[in-house]
Each structure stands twice: as structure tokens, then as C-alpha cells.
């Protein structure tokens, strides 16, 4: 394709590439999902209060996401599972912590209560 008059084509492309900004109006009307609302809140986002714990003396402890809050409630709630080391009787709130304790062979020290008395060893089931 041989085009002889490049100046005319360049002028046509330049004219068509200029948008008419006067007809656009407010950008908030065109992009409501991208621009935040004027009052600062956006729909569908979590508020600061959603991931806070007010139970069992936490006084509004804030968590980064909901799953961390759920794990916190499970571990610190009244019906929390306790994982006990079969060697020394240490208590853990997570089975992974108990397993790591066993892998590191941390059972060689005597477990004591906060008052200094030795904690009895757990009974081993036959």
C-alpha cells in the first residue's frame, strides 16, 4: 500500500486521537468501583472492628485477617484443645508446637509449676 500524502494521514490521526473531555462529566460517574466514595468508606470492605477480639480479656486485640481471629478464639476459648507432651507433660495449644518440641528433644528439663514445684509426669496409657 503506497500512501503519498503522509501529512494528511498524520493530521487525521491527530484529530481523531483527541478525546472530548467536556462530554465526560465527573470521573466518579464513569468509574464508581475504582474511585472511593466521598465519605471515605467503600462498599464491601471490612471495618476495623471486624477482626478484633473482645472476649476473654483481649480488650479489642486486632488481627490482620479473619482466619487469625478464628484461630485465636479456638486456642484461647474455653473449649480449647490441649496437646500434651507424653514425655514431660508440657502443654501446647497447637499440635505442631508439641511435635516441634518432641523433634527438638526439649523434654530433658523438668517441668515446674509457676510456684516452683515439679509438675507430675503424665500417666502413660497402656
UniProtKB/Swiss-Prot annotation:
Residues 38-48 have a biased composition (Polar residues). Coiled coil: none annotated. It comes from Phoma sp. (strain ATCC 20986 / MF5453). Its main location: nucleus. A zinc finger (C2H2-type) spans 51-76, 83-115. Residues 115-126 have a biased composition (Basic and acidic residues). Keywords: Metal-binding, Nucleus, Repeat, Transcription, Transcription regulation, Zinc, Zinc-finger. It is found in: Nucleus. Residues 17-52, 103-126 are annotated as: Disordered. Transcription factor that probably regulates the expression of the gene cluster that mediates the biosynthesis of squalestatin S1 (SQS1, also known as zaragozic acid A), a heavily oxidized fungal polyketide that offers potent cholesterol lowering activity by targeting squalene synthase (SS). Belongs to the GLI C2H2-type zinc-finger protein family. InterPro entries: Znf_C2H2_sf. GO terms for molecular function: zinc ion binding. This is C2H2-type zinc-finger transcription factor M5. One of its GO terms (cellular component) is nucleus. Transmembrane segments: none annotated.
